[in-house]
């Protein structure tokens, strides 16, 4: 299975069978990668320090794609491409960085968020929309 970066929108809907089944299969296949901006979004939901630590531990088993200056520069470049189309205010900074990291790693990006479809129109990178 190809390495996949899983957006926050997928993690939040993981209890829906149309999302959870493919996500579970990818996790079992050791094909899921995490990027810091997505992890930070997920950790915002922690109820306190203990919950925060538990969530971090759950995601610690996933592959990591570190962010670097090239990924940051690519995110800015993609945002510029979106601006030329009038869509630069849609995708968040997290979306742009996650997409750039996935692209750099040659990973597919899984989402439940239409912003990634806009990003992929600029980048041509592989994405997969899960859920309904």
Where are these regions (language model features)?
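Short, well-structured N-terminal submotif of metal-dependent ribonuclease cores
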Residues: 1-34, 43-57
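Active-site phosphate/pyrophosphate-handling residues
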Residues: 9, 41, 96-100
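Active-site-proximal, substrate-binding regions of enzyme catalytic domains
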Residues: 50-63, 68-70
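Active-site neighborhoods of divalent-metal-dependent phosphate/nucleic-acid chemistry enzymes
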Residues: 64-112
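A generic structural signal for short hydrophobic patches within well-formed alpha-helices
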Residues: 11-12, 39-42, 72, 116-117
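Short, hinge-like loop/turn segments at secondary-structure boundaries
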Residues: 49-53, 83, 126-130
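A secondary-structure boundary/capping signal
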Residues: 7-8, 38, 112
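Acidic, PIN/NYN-like endoribonuclease modules and their adjacent C-terminal/linker elements
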Residues: 1-3, 16, 99, 103-132
């Amino acid at each position: 299975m190809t390495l996949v970066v899983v957006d926050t929108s997928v993690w939040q809907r993981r209890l829906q069978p149309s999302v959870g089944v493919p996500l579970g299969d990818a996790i079992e296949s050791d094909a899921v990668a995490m990027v810091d901006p997505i992890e930070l979004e997920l950790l915002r939901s922690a109820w306190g320090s203990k919950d925060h630590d538990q969530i971090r531990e759950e995601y610690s088993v996933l592959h990591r794609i570190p962010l670097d200056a090239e990924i940051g520069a690519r995110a800015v470049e993609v945002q510029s491409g979106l601006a030329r189309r009038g869509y630069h205010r849609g995708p968040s900074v997290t979306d742009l960085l996650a997409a750039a990291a996935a692209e750099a790693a040659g990973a597919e990006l899984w989402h439940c968020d239409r912003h990634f479809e806009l990003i992929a129109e600029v980048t041509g990178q592989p994405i997969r929309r899960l859920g309904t």
